[in-house]
Amino acid sequence: MAILKPFNLNQWIDENRHLLKPPVGNKNIYVDSEDYIVMIVAGPNARKDYHYNETEELFYQLEGEITVYVQDNGEKKAMKLSAGDMYLHPAKTPHSPNRSEGSIGLVIEQKRAGTNAKDGLLWFCENCNNKLYDVYFPLTDIEKDFLHHFEHFYNSKDLRTCTKCGTVMESDPRFTVK
């Protein structure tokens, strides 16, 4: 990566808010970095999936609030962050970042392209926390690679139906094919 001049992150956010739109609302700000994905992520989002990453992720909340739901030994737990709060999320622990309206956060994680590392997306029943579906894949572009998997899950009633209690997770209209 070439040496880049420092820049004012708050100014960058103000100039690029129009790019930070749902459903995921993220923008990689150092695309040419060889080692890290450095993203600004905006809310609101309504993701019901959990992300699996084989490396740690750093969350720093700049504006508003985020709740990072985690799956810890079969139990759903909530990590709440307000502006100024930071959280280092452990590797190999499914997590679901849920951002409030108007929130902005910085997320830093290691690049996985060119490694044997796999990313994963998992969905859990909202009633009993039973795992509904999971998929693991090599990540090459964090702004694009999740979309296909979201569409596959939300367009299948079978995948969204809990085999333990029968609850059906609502389909997300942003990812369903009409």
Located regions from the model:
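Short, non-ligating residues that shape and space the ligands of small metal-coordination modules
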Residues: 134-137, 171-172
